[in-house]
């Protein structure tokens, strides 16, 4: 009598479309547009793409087009769902602390279902932690494929695993950004922004101990006596302590901005002249570059997206926690229109060439094709 996994493998062989399943922790709002794009493109390539996750970010206002199942983490429930989907390949997008990753990854391997891990390869806030890195390295060895946020992360992977690396430069779906026809001045007027030039900060402020360092910008503008230059802060989690330090003459806090078409946040980016996220730039860098905003940030523990920044070409990187240098670079760009325009043009050109949604999809497709082609006959489980 055939096991359920043998039936799963037999069903796969007679289907017209192959199936790739992404198993994720919380799906953030900015990933929804990405997965919608993946779903459409995978279908064009003869694949069915679906997502299984423990939750969808509550603030999400984007329409979910891709097949999506939301259910709390439970190994037995997830095993049942995987069997029902019968994927040709599974991609895990989970943290080490998501305990389900351990039984799930081993069961997938034991069942003969090829499994890849979408990974930063290390906790980049603590990249030299030997204990944590041992767990990362174990997963690198266990997986049939590794999808990296950027190529630079291969430095954390053993050369013996290079053959199973696939690079999918992390990005957002620029195709879903609306065209903004209003002028900078019209947008400023609608938001009540009186400044001739705007420095923009965006991001989740309270995340992991203010790692984006918005306080550095607040302190710069607290001491700045220039009515022509202002700071606009967008994001959740600004504490009362930080709010109390804001200079109301030149700083505006707009809070968290979400809307179904990304129109409001796109208008905010268009009205700005410079983007500064002093720490942990994340995908805010991609969004800033798309709108032609040079980035001014600090060295230190930065995420993979920092690879898109080239100091002096599309932005500036100053020494870590050097607030004086951060201030100097911001003011230099604000006062030198030609230099700002040069960096602006480079920023948009660079992000479109290095971090398009199609190139990101290409990394996922290449991984799925490789996993499916090397699929083993499952053993009983």
Q: PLM ranges: what are they?
A:
Residues 21-23, 193-212, 218-222, 231-232:
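Conserved donor-binding/catalytic core segment of Leloir-type glycosyltransferases
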Residues 325, 332, 339-353, 360:
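A short, well-ordered alpha-helix in the C-terminal region of glycosyltransferases
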Residues 240-260:
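Nucleotide-activated donor-binding/catalytic signature segment of Leloir-type glycosyltransferases, i.e.
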Residues 141-183, 193, 201:
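Donor nucleotide-sugar binding/catalytic pocket of nucleotide-sugar-dependent glycosyltransferases
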Residues 113-131, 142-145:
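A short, histidine- and acid-enriched strand-loop-helix "catalytic/donor-clamping" loop
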Residues 294-303:
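Short hydrophobic beta-strand element within catalytic cores of glycosyltransferases
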Residues 267-283, 293-294:
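Acidic donor-binding loop of glycosyltransferase active sites
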Residues 311-323, 332-338:
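Conserved acidic donor-binding segment of nucleotide-sugar-dependent glycosyltransferases
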């Amino acid at each position: 009598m055939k096991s359920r996994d043998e039936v799963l493998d037999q069903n796969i062989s007679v289907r017209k479309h192959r199936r790739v399943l992404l198993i994720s922790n919380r799906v953030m709002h900015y990933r929804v547009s990405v997965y919608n794009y993946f779903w459409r493109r995978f279908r064009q390539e003869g694949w069915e793409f679906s997502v299984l996750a423990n939750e969808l970010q509550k603030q999400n206002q984007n329409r979910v087009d891709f097949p999506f199942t939301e259910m709390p983490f439970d190994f037995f429930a997830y095993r049942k769902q995987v069997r029902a989907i019968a994927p040709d390949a599974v991609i895990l997008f989970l943290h080490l602390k998501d305990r389900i990753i351990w039984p799930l990854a081993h069961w997938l391997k034991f069942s003969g279902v090829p499994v890849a891990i979408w990974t930063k390869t290390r906790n980049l806030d603590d990249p030299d932690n030997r204990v944590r890195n041992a767990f990362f390295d174990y997963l690198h060895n266990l997986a049939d494929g590794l999808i990296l946020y950027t190529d630079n992360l291969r430095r954390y992977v053993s050369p013996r695993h290079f053959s199973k690396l696939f690079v999918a430069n992390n990005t957002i779906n620029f195709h879903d950004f609306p065209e903004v026809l209003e002028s900078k001045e019209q947008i400023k007027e609608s938001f009540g922004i009186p400044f001739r030039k705007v420095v923009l900060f965006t991001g989740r402020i309270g995340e992991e101990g203010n790692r984006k360092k918005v306080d550095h910008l607040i302190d710069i503008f607290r001491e700045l006596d220039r009515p022509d230059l202002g700071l606009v802060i967008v994001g959740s989690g600004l504490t009362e302590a930080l709010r109390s330090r804001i200079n109301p003459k030149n700083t505006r806090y707009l809070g968290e901005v979400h809307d179904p078409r990304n129109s409001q946040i796109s208008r905010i980016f268009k009205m700005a002249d410079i983007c500064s996220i002093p720490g942990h730039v994340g995908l805010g860098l991609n969004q800033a570059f798309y709108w032609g905003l040079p980035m001014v940030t600090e060295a230190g523990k930065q995420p993979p997206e920092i690879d898109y920044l080239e100091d002096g070409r599309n932005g500036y990187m100053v020494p870590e926690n050097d607030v004086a240098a951060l201030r100097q670079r911001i003011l230099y760009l604000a006062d030198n229109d030609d230099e700002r325009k040069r960096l602006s043009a480079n920023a948009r050109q660079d992000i479109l060439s290095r971090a398009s949604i199609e190139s990101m999809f290409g990394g996922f497709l290449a991984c799925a094709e490789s996993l499916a082609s090397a699929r083993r006959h499952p053993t009983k489980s």
